[in-house]
Amino acid sequence: MPKIIAFDQEAREAIRRGVSKLARTVKVTLGPKGRNVILQKSFGSPTVTKDGVTVAKEIELEDPYENMGASMVREVASKTSDVAGDGTTTATVMAEAIFNEGLKAVVAGVNPIQMKSGIETAVSDITEQLHSMAVKVKDQEAMANVATIASNNDREIGTLLADAMSKVGKDGVITVDEGKSLQTEQEWVEGMQFDRGYLSPYFVTDSTSMEVVLEDAYVLVFEKKISNIKDMVPLLEKVVQQGKPLLIIAEDVDGEALATLVINRLRGTFTVCAVKAPGYGDRRKAMMEDIAILTGGQAIFEALGVKLESVDLPQLGRAKKIIVDKDNTTVIEGGGKSADIKARIDQIRREIELSTSDYDREKLEERLAKLAGGVAKVNVGAATESEMKEKKARVEDALHATRAAVEEGILPGGGVALLRASGKVKAADTLTDDQLVGYNIVLRACRAPLTMISENAGQDGGIVCEKVLAMKGNEGYNALTDVYEDLVKSGVIDPTKVTRTALGNAASVATLLLTSDALVAEKPEKSGKAGHGGDHDMY
């Protein structure tokens, strides 16, 4: 495939155009008075969003050189979103500001490598300053404020998420699902719940709610299908002697085995319920082991040389209460040893750290929460599918941001933290002239987020920046109410992690672009005229 190459000024100019196109599209969404962007979809209704990373991911430019610049900045937005969950638009605005300032300096003859070193020093100094300004999140109100800001000033989402976070704690899992009603609701699932219901409605013990409720029950976890009741008879006899109910979790229970269990249940011989094992493949094995550890039993795997007919009561798990409906099974207060459960949780944590796939990480986090004792579910409600998609994305962003706030503390929002931090740092005397240029570029770029927030709110960005600089501490410009006030008190706050990540990622990509001097792209193919249809070319 032939390539096309651009050098020096031509290359930098092409990158600048690409960066500018992407940044201009994303910038309009910044701040409480930011505008929406409408994205065309190849099928279905267009998506209306105010989420920076969603907009950035959609942008592909026709010119291959411009597209390179745009996709590098797109990387800033998605990396910031992955790590901190919010701050994607701030990162894009910062990247453009650093790149544009740096480009002027490079054209004027500054050495890009020296300048890069100065930029990195400034980022490191400002990050240190941000950490020293950070305040720990102590109460639910502060969490609600963080979530409200991250969900584009939706107070309902903020309060819901803060409530959920306070229930599940720092390590707990909160899942975001599409709800069935117009309201966004939150539900709390205690104990370990998995999405498998009873195999026969004849197991039901409470006919009004159509649930099986087993108190102080035994739990059998078996990896294979159970079709023949003969293998189970010795175990069932021992359970009947104890007078306790039994939950069977297996790949499947069918045929004669299921029929015998149902008949004994209907006759009142003993209370029993059978459900399929959760998950698929290797994940199913891992989840079965989780259930066994939680209930203090042993997962019966034939690969380990344990046969079903030789299973004894000590190998069964125990649980204080088990509730099974047609879709879900919930095990409450399993009888597992806390040391074993803790060891299993630590093992899953290590797997999460090593995991490279987002999907695997999400599933591992779910398993972790189920072992740790509960999951909070947020069911997002909306009137239309388009609104549902947009709202769900906002809830997920807000969730990430709230987690980040609990982790590293909070700062005043509205672009003020960066402005304050940049005003407090000073370049060391040891820097060379070119490094000093890079250092000062970052200090000037720290004004960009506040300038953009003000301009989206219909104010003059330069004037607002100067007014805020003259103030002290957490005081700044609240674009939502158009008032200068203490931002932390009025709930305009950003997680430290979000601000720090946005600055770091923006500087990283901007310096990469500034130190690049040639672009190599594939030559676009010229497509010839389309052939005639029909039998035109027969004559």
Swiss-Prot record:
One Gene Ontology term, aspect cellular component: GroEL-GroES complex
Catalyzed chemical reaction(s): ATP + H2O + a folded polypeptide = ADP + phosphate + an unfolded polypeptide
A Pfam family of this chain: Cpn60_TCP1
InterPro entries, sorted: Chaperonin_Cpn60_CS, Cpn60/GroEL, Cpn60/GroEL/TCP-1, GroEL-like_apical_dom_sf, GROEL-like_equatorial_sf, TCP-1-like_intermed_sf
UniProt-recorded Gene Ontology molecular function terms: ATP binding; ATP-dependent protein folding chaperone; isomerase activity; unfolded protein binding
Residues annotated for ATP binding in this entry: 29-32, 50, 86-90, 414, 478-480, 494
Primary location recorded for the protein, binned into one broad class: cytoplasm
Top-level taxonomic group: Bacteria
EC id: 5.6.1.7
UniProtKB keywords: ATP-binding, Chaperone, Cytoplasm, Isomerase, Nucleotide-binding
Top enzyme category: isomerase
Entry-linked PROSITE patterns: CHAPERONINS_CPN60
Location(s), subcellular: Cytoplasm
Gene Ontology annotations of biological process type: chaperone cofactor-dependent protein refolding; protein refolding; response to heat
Family classification: Belongs to the chaperonin (HSP60) family.
Known function: Together with its co-chaperonin GroES, plays an essential role in assisting protein folding. The GroEL-GroES system forms a nano-cage that allows encapsulation of the non-native substrate proteins and provides a physical environment optimized to promote and accelerate protein folding.
Quaternary structure and partners: Forms a cylinder of 14 subunits composed of two heptameric rings stacked back-to-back. Interacts with the co-chaperonin GroES.
Protein name: Chaperonin GroEL 3
Native source species: Rhodopirellula baltica (strain DSM 10527 / NCIMB 13988 / SH1)
Gene field: groEL3
